[in-house]
Design a protein with these regions (language model features):
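Low-complexity, glycine/alanine/valine/leucine- and proline-rich hydrophobic stretches
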Residues: 153-216
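Short, functional C-terminal segments
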Residues: 110, 117-176
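Long, charge-rich, low-complexity alpha-helical segments
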Residues: 1-140, 196, 201-257
Length: 257
């Protein structure tokens, strides 16, 4: 028997999908018959559920422990971990929540979950030097237009057109009360890690569009045009200043020499 076959069989026995009709391989029968196996299986599932609860604190705060753990239980059996670091577990949970029946009356929950995931990805991302305003100011206008700036590896951003996802998320993360006068409108968010801790700030639609364009390899001129297409009233200099202060852009190698 190949090691990979054993690992796949054991994994399917530990976290069988709900309603699975395919029985485990016959060679696993002896293992499954052991009284301790059920305990181990429950421990594995609990560890995954605990990880989701820890990795999605804003969602947890919004829906409560029982609701979240029920949703996590369903997710775990459909999407078992593929990484030994449980802190990284939960990619796809936002999309799962958007199709989860009990969340039908919480249409903003998926967007909030995406911001929780952005925090995790920013926290785990590789270190890299951030672009400095002084270097950018030294570039000639014609050279600046042709620059292909890249988002920092730890930068994450999201635009939610329908819900105030950032304010909802921020209130849960920071323990802030919800403002009854908060307008129910689309919002964007930027998460970065310029030093050791993840930081966050609101980001307008134009800022999200600019970062989307930079991530796709657009020149700075084209990225600026896409930002203005998203919001013709955007203040581009102020927007770029925000991205620089937040460490959202990666320093080109030429700026490090």
């Amino acid at each position: 028997m190949r090691l990979s076959d054993f690992q796949d069989g054991l994994a399917s026995a530990l976290l069988p999908p709900p309603g699975a009709s395919v029985p485990p391989p016959a060679w696993l029968d002896a293992l499954l018959a052991q009284p301790g196996f059920a305990v181990y299986r429950n421990t594995v599932a609990k560890g995954c559920i605990d990880a989701l609860q820890a990795n999605y604190p804003a969602v947890h705060a919004l829906v409560g422990t029982d609701w979240l753990r029920a949703a996590a239980h369903a997710f775990v059996h459909k999407h078992p971990p593929t990484d030994g670091r449980l802190m990284a577990y939960g990619a796809g949970f936002a999309e799962f929540l958007e199709g989860f029946g009990p969340a039908a009356n919480l249409p903003y929950l998926g967007a909030v979950a995406r911001l929780d995931r952005c925090w995790t990805e920013s926290h785990l991302a590789a270190d890299a030097p951030a672009l400095q305003a002084a270097w950018l100011a030294q570039q000639a206008p014609e050279a600046l237009a042709l620059l292909r700036l890249q988002p920092h590896p730890a930068a994450r951003w999201q635009w939610c057109a329908e819900h105030p996802a950032y304010t909802l998320w921020q209130c849960q993360r920071d323990g802030l009360p919800w403002d009854a006068d908060q307008p129910w409108q689309g919002e964007g968010a930027l998460l970065t890690r310029p030093h050791d801790a993840v930081q966050w700030a609101p980001l307008p639609h134009a800022g999200c569009a600019l970062l989307d364009a930079c991530a796709a390899g657009a020149t700075f001129e084209d990225a600026a045009a896409q930002a203005l297409q998203a919001d013709p009233t955007a203040d581009l200099p102020a927007l770029v200043a925000l991205l620089l202060r937040s460490g959202a852009l990666r320093a080109p190698e030429t700026s490090l020499n």
